[in-house]
Amino acid sequence: MVTLDLHGYGWMLWRGLGLTILVGLGAMALAVTFGLLGAWGKLSRYRAARWLADTYTTVIRGVPELILILLVYYGVPTLIQDLAASAGHDLRVDLNPFVAGIATIGLIYGAFATEVFRGAFQAVPRGQIEAARAFGMGRALMLRRIVLPQMWRFALPGLGNVWMVLIKATALISVIQLEELMRSADIAARATRLPFTFFFAASLFYLGITIVSMVIQGRIESWSYRGAQRG
């Protein structure tokens, strides 16, 4: 009979849930950073910056996420060790799976956030920017007073979608032995031979994260539009 504590493994799923949320939040922060840099690059007047941003988004969106995770976790340390060996140094490099997971997921979804921010920047009315220039606003002041407040408002729906996909993608880092929700469910399923029970429980946890995220996103969007609605 399935008990409420999931045969003694309920604590493991809750711990895995906490780790999944931590990885998701860290990766989202990194994705926003990469996204802002990528959007700046795509909209830059410098050809090199545009080329780097285009290359980044094309490569990341063209390579399967699982391959990128394995490449970062297993490939990067091996590459560093080989380079050190060729220079005559005996070096051992081990990546922390938690750090590797955040870095890789953040890098991947930064490419998608790049397009979100690019569209948000372009959605800011040009007339307002030209009016700010006519009033003698400097670039920094115009960015802070005119562009960024509106850009974030336009970007919020897209960033919410990025978060929804990102948090589910954290399940992929179970392949690098990080005991997040998916890995914890797999361990419990193998130990008890009850795969349906634990994978179904994990799916409910993911669904719960999604529902809570949708509620929070809706409230943030409503708050961000208060000024526009009053205007």
Language model region names:
Residues 1-231:
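Transmembrane alpha-helices and adjacent helix-loop boundaries
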